């Protein structure tokens, strides 16, 4: 959670300076780097470092996505779009323990049989047998890669923020 405190304001400044798409891309890139690092180097210090990197990216995503929800459906549909986003997050929080349980079960050295499932075979090849839970980091890495490609290929219109949404709107930070 310290990463949120550290990155939220700088992410807002980056949005003001560079726009939404680069910050959104970077917001997915940082967790991609964090999950890849831990999936490859599964030590406790790397877990701490990768969790912090993932947190920085998630703070960036929250900072850029919340205002984009207002743009997606228009001001009049903002509440609906925000609720749909929360619904999707709720589905993910419901499904993730099921995916985790499935991966732990299928990658158990006593149960795993090569050749039954291509995806499980792939994960078995890159996940240590004694740490099957690391496979979830590989799944997250794959999902983040898909999001990076999607954001990279997407076209973003120029989005004007509401005056109150911009850091520049506050006189507290402006030199006198």
Q: Which residues make up each language-model segment?
A:
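C-terminal membrane-cytosol helix-exit motif in multi-pass small-molecule transporters
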Residues: 100-109, 118, 122, 128, ...
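Intracellular juxtamembrane helix-capping segments at the cytosolic ends
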Residues: 60-74
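Primarily marks hydrophobic transmembrane alpha-helices of the MFS/SLC 12-helix fold
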Residues: 21-24, 47
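Central cavity-lining transmembrane alpha-helices of secondary-active solute carriers
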Residues: 1-13
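Hydrophobic core of transmembrane alpha-helices in multi-pass small-molecule transporters
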Residues: 46-61
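Helix-breaking motifs and short loop linkers at transmembrane-helix boundaries and internal kinks
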Residues: 19, 40-45
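Glycine-rich segments within core transmembrane alpha-helices of 12-TM secondary carriers
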Residues: 77-111
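MFS-fold secondary transporters
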Residues: 34-38, 54
């Amino acid at each position: 959670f310290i990463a949120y405190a550290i990155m939220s304001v700088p992410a807002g400044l980056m949005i003001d300076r560079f726009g939404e798409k680069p910050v959104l891309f970077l917001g997915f890139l940082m967790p991609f780097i964090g999950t890849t690092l831990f999936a490859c180097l599964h030590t406790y210090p790397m877990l701490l470092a990768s969790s912090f990197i993932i947190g920085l990216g998630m703070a960036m995503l929250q900072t850029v996505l919340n205002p984009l929800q207002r743009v997606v459906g228009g001001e009049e549909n903002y509440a609906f779009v925000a609720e749909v986003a929360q619904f999707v997050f709720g589905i993910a929080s419901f499904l993730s323990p099921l995916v985790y349980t499935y991966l732990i079960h299928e990658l158990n050295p006593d149960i795993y049989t090569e050749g039954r499932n291509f995806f499980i075979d792939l994960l078995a090849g890159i996940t240590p047998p004694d740490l099957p839970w690391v496979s979830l980091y590989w799944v997250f890495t794959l999902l983040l890669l898909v999001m990076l490609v999607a954001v990279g290929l997407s076209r973003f219109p120029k989005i004007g923020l509401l005056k109150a949404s911009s850091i520049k709107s506050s006189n507290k930070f402006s030199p006198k």
